[in-house]
Design a protein with these regions (language model features):
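Signature of Gram-negative chaperone-usher
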Residues: 17-19, 41-207
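Long, low-complexity serine/threonine/glycine- and acidic-rich segments characteristic of extracellular
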Residues: 1-42
């Protein structure tokens, strides 16, 4: 509002989104009054930091109870795992990583499902254009699926996290969907729950 005949106090605001690219920004303000007298100030700058961050859901990956020893190429019943880019830095291909652990039997702890029996992909097994073949290798040496290694971070092939508005929920704008396959259940293990309780959670991160 007007302070006097020659001075006015003007307030404004500018929205900054979490996906705006980091760097130096200039603040430019100009004002023209009713008599076309004009003034401006372009001397102020600010720096928006670059932030690498993700949010992952769901927190639990589950399989149907009818999975038995010898079963092959089983897909999760609550996929995909959604990885949201909540920062403003693009994650390039293969730099979304997963660290898996062997799944230990909750009753008989000497029995386990090896982490290497799982594979992951950014396409699911219902993809009809194959190759690529989705998260299950199905006996095919697919270069697109990524096999897990116990306790070691593995970059997921073709996984890209663009910078964008992930709330669009379209699987591409600031978002990646990944699908996990249990390629085979070892013969000779008993029917029981196998989980991460003993060796720790699986971790999805970015490099």
């Amino acid at each position: 509002g007007d302070i006097n005949t020659t001075t006015a106090n003007i307030s404004c605001s500018v929205m900054i989104f979490y996906f705006d690219v980091g760097g130096e920004y200039n603040i430019s303000v100009g004002y023209a009054d009713a008599s076309d007298a004009f003034t401006q100030n372009i001397t102020h700058n600010f720096t928006l930091a670059s932030t690498s961050a993700i949010q992952v859901s769901p927190n639990n990956l589950t399989y149907d109870s009818d999975v038995n020893p010898g079963s092959k190429n089983i897909t999760s019943n609550n996929d995909p795992i959604t990885v949201n880019n909540t920062g403003n830095v693009q994650v390039t291909s293969g730099n979304v990583r997963i660290t898996a652990q062997n799944l230990i039997g909750e009753t008989t702890k000497t029995q386990y499902i090896p982490a290497l029996n799982f594979s992951v992909d950014v396409l699911n097994s219902t993809y009809g254009g194959g190759p690529p073949y989705g998260e299950c290798l199905d006996g095919i040496d697919s270069q697109n699926s990524t096999n897990f290694t116990n306790g070691t971070a593995q970059g997921i092939n073709n996984s890209i996290l663009a910078v964008g508005k992930h709330s669009l929920q379209n699987g591409t704008s600031g978002q990646e969907h990944i699908f996990v396959c249990l390629k085979s259940v070892p013969l000779g293990i008993s029917i029981q729950s196998y989980s991460t309780l003993e060796l720790g959670e699986w971790v999805i991160d970015i490099a």
